[in-house]
Structures are given as C-alpha cells and as structure tokens.
Amino acid sequence: MKKQLLSALIGVSLLAPMAASAADYVIDTEGAHASITFKVNHLGYSYVVGRFNDFSGDFSYDAAKPTAMTVNVTVNTLSVDSNHAERDKHIRGEDFLNTGKFAKATFASTSVEDKGNGDLVINGNLTLNGVTKPLAIKAHAVGEGQDPWGGYRAGFTGTTTFAMKDFGIKMDLGPASSHVELDLVVEGVRK
C-alpha cells in the first residue's frame, strides 16, 4: 500500500510541471479575431490608416511564466489595404513595401519582459522590405479561457512604432510622416 501511494505521489509530482507548461496557439485569422492595422501621419495634417488582410502566425504562452512566450507571424505584404486602390498600388511599389521583391514580412520573438498586470514587452526581429531589425512590441494579455465551441483561447493587444528608413523604405514623406504605428489584436486558438 505504501509503495502504491509513493508511486502515485511520484507520478503526480512528475506531471505537475507539465500541467503548468506553455500552451501552443494558432492565431485566429479565419474567424477575423485578429488584426494588424497601421497608421502613418499624412504630411502633418492627418493620418492614413490601413491594415494587412492576409497574415498567419502562432504563439506559445503560459500565464504563470509569460517570459517564456514565443511569437511568430508572417504577413503577406501584398494584402496591404488603405481603403484606396491607387494608394495601395503605390504602397506595394518600390517606394514603400516593394512587394514584387519582398512579398512577405515576418516577426519572430527573441525575448519577453513581464511588466506585471498582464503588460508585456515582446522583443523580436521584424523582417520587412528585405531588412531585419530588432523591434519591441508593448503588449497586454487581455484574457484566456474556454470558448463556446469547446476550444481554448488567449488574446492580446499590442502597439509598436518603427522608422520607415530603418527598413529601407525609400519614400520620404517628411519628418511628420517618417514613422509607422502598428496596432495589433491577436486571439489564438489552442492547438
């Protein structure tokens, strides 16, 4: 009896760390529960706002150990949509995204900082227009739990800003328009 109890306790103690381990999620783009939107100052007067309609990715997350989080995203840059066909054609061209040569942009996390209360800084490498540079995303864990269809979901928001010139974007729109602001909404479905 003591041997059985000891064996059971050892078995439970070996399984306990696995229960607290990170879960893998796929970003839910099919259900339109994720978005990548951008904003660029337009000549100091207003903003051009747009989005990327085609992207995919995954992440690994454990709320008990958020610093172990990993994120990988691929964006089809041809899917840029600023709600203006002629402008989108220009954005896809050599002055901006050069999609004829670089049809994909990627982000791969390298580390995560836990700032408390669900706030994170996700550090990683953004590859855009054939150039790879470090990028930090200020993120917030919105929540996680069971969905009505028997799955499990986790959601995050994020923001970041980068200088267009850092990624070899040739078009100079002036100092007021030199940076791109990204707003991210991510909902993942546990695999």
Swiss-Prot record:
The keyword Methyltransferase belongs to this UniProt entry's keyword annotation: no
Main location: periplasm
One Gene Ontology term, aspect cellular component: periplasmic space
Subcellular localization: Periplasm
Keyword list, A-Z: Periplasm, Signal
Signal peptide: 1-22
Top-level lineage group: Bacteria
Keyword Signal attributed: yes
Family listed: Belongs to the UPF0312 family. Type 1 subfamily.
Protein name (record): UPF0312 protein Sputcn32_2702
Organism of this sequence: Shewanella putrefaciens (strain CN-32 / ATCC BAA-453)
